[in-house]
Amino acid sequence: SDGCTSGPTMADHLGYYAEAGLTAEGVKGSSDVEALGTNQVDVATGMMAKMLVPITNGVDITFTGGAHIGCKSLYVLADSEYATTADLKGQKISVPNGIGKSDYNITALLLDADGINYSTDVELVQVSADACVTAMENGEIAAALLSDTFAYAMVKDGKLKCIRSQLDTDFADRVCCVMAMNGTFVKENPTIAKKVAQAVQKAHSYMRDNPEEATKVLMDMGWNGGNYEMNIMINNSLQFGLSDEFTGDTLKDFIERYIRLGLITSMDNADEILDLAWTPVL
């Protein structure tokens, strides 16, 4: 894990696993959902929007704590006519990692919060993040959901502007990324799972309470790219180390929204989904 999902690796770097009598091995891969679900790894931090639907489809993952808010926003060309999500009606919006994936789900929720139907009022299409600006300039798309880290320099240079964000007031009290574990691992090793969660949350608290020092560590270790100014600003905005109450409230709310919006289709009982997806161990 790296960037905003670096809590588990930061916990190892700071010696928190060792303090708890645990040893840890970092694994670099392309899919934390697959790795967690098949028990190749025990813990990872990642987007709730990426993992919630697979959980309802039988993937053996459960959330054990919250990591942070924020992460991604809707961006348009700075000199475009688009100022709000309402201006995007009838337009194409890129969800870079694909239809049905986390960008798609986040965009659906952002639009829905403004009374816009993601399936009828706009067209969500996949354009890779690095091609989105060119696609906007060519008129192929009007907007894109991008990570705030990716968009930072282009906003500063006056190329892009943000018109809707997970840092806006109505989403700033909602989790973006969560700590997740293999479900069977948690059931069979509750004591170890608790120790792991404590170590990761201790790392999140360190990152929140010591943003300058933590950002330097993240950059020195290669877990944060870009410049220090950008990283300190973004890391401060994420509010690392969310309470179980905060995370549980987000899950209850988002599960109901996912069902209503048709993002979750294999189950329709919110309480049953919550039981699968939420296993606070602290």
Describe each region flagged by the PLM:
Residues 1-117, 123-126, 142-148, 159-166, ...:
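Short, glycine-/small- and polar/acidic-enriched structural segments
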Residues 255-282:
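Conserved C-terminal helix/tail region of periplasmic/extracytoplasmic solute-binding proteins
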Residues 20, 54, 154, 188-189, ...:
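Residues that scaffold the ATP/ADP-binding catalytic core of kinase and kinase-like folds
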